Amino acid sequence: MTMVASWTRNHILDLTDWRGEELDIVLQTATTFQQVLSGQTKKVPALQGQVVTNLFFEPSTRTRSSFELAAKRLSADVMNFSPGTSSLTKGETILDTAKTYLAMGSDIFVIRHQQAGVPHFIASQMDRLQTGVKVLNAGDGQHEHPSQGLLDLFTICSQFAPDNPAIQCLQGKKIAVVGDILHSRVARSNLWSLTTAGADVHLAGPPTLLPKEFQQLTLAPGSGKLHCHWQLQPALEGADIVMTLRLQKERMTAHLLPSLREYHHYFGITHDRLKVCQPGVKVLHPGPVNRGVEISSELMDDPDISLIQDQVTSGVAIRMALLYLLGTVQE
């Protein structure tokens, strides 16, 4: 592949200030890698000789596996960090851990941490030390999860424009995002990427899980609109896409929800509830899924409506694109 001359970001930390052109670069690059993955070779030497280090301070299965596979498909060498068996248990700081992997020759850090801001901190320190190391945020606390936001964007655009996924296909589309907005870094990344792409995003959830701060967000000029609903029906009416989010019980304090059964009664997504959406509506979920809570099992397994497995497939191509763009950006 040739260098993407118009790509200038040294780190991918959030999606708050991305331009539409940058989103399209990622989508175009991911489309190329999707074609590679569907072919016989499945591997390219784009990052041969570079080292990608996965610094996951928080448990992860699908994101870590997806990044590891993406790096290997680009022919990069991969190192994986596990906090339970690391020197963190002996008092080592996060920065010293990063410096240790830096000394081993890391070129790209993929960082997940339960505390918001850690990837930004490591990126700032790598820049201060003039290391040339790139940082990719794989999810930090309740802040953002940019690669998930981009893979969701790619999955959705691939539905509306399968031959050439680009953000223009989302102009004026209505996308409902339903569930635990309060604790969701996925929701935050998605609302930035989708509105920048021109879609109108409708957030829906119980008042305890949909804070008023989202109503006060300032979007870039020309972006789609953002709406908040404490009832499900207005968000679903006329929706082209419905994204449901996991209830993050591990992050919740008491009394945010009466019960999981009551949540499903008011906000669970089912075939019946989708009748008010646009014909051909599709459903996404970033996973892992609580079946029968956020979404019914029947709907989740419906190949005509559910794009959940498509999201997993898109994830590898998008992460290949992001690693490639960071690994080939000119300083």
Curated annotation (Swiss-Prot):
Binding residues annotated for L-aspartate, in chain numbering: K90, R185, R246
Domain of life: Bacteria
Keyword Transferase: yes
Keywords assigned by UniProt, alphabetized: Pyrimidine biosynthesis, Transferase
GO molecular function, one term: aspartate carbamoyltransferase activity
Disulfide bond positions: none
Binding site for carbamoyl phosphate: R62, T63, R112, H145, Q148, G287, P288
A biological process term (GO) from this entry: 'de novo' UMP biosynthetic process
Pathway: Pyrimidine metabolism; UMP biosynthesis via de novo pathway; (S)-dihydroorotate from bicarbonate: step 2/3
Keyword Transferase: yes
EC number: 2.1.3.2
Reaction it catalyzes: carbamoyl phosphate + L-aspartate = N-carbamoyl-L-aspartate + phosphate + H(+)
Annotated family: Belongs to the aspartate/ornithine carbamoyltransferase superfamily. ATCase family.
Subunit structure: Heterododecamer (2C3:3R2) of six catalytic PyrB chains organized as two trimers (C3), and six regulatory PyrI chains organized as three dimers (R2).
Protein task: Catalyzes the condensation of carbamoyl phosphate and aspartate to form carbamoyl aspartate and inorganic phosphate, the committed step in the de novo pyrimidine nucleotide biosynthesis pathway.
Name of the protein this chain belongs to: Aspartate carbamoyltransferase catalytic subunit
Natural source organism: Synechocystis sp. (strain ATCC 27184 / PCC 6803 / Kazusa)
The encoding gene: pyrB
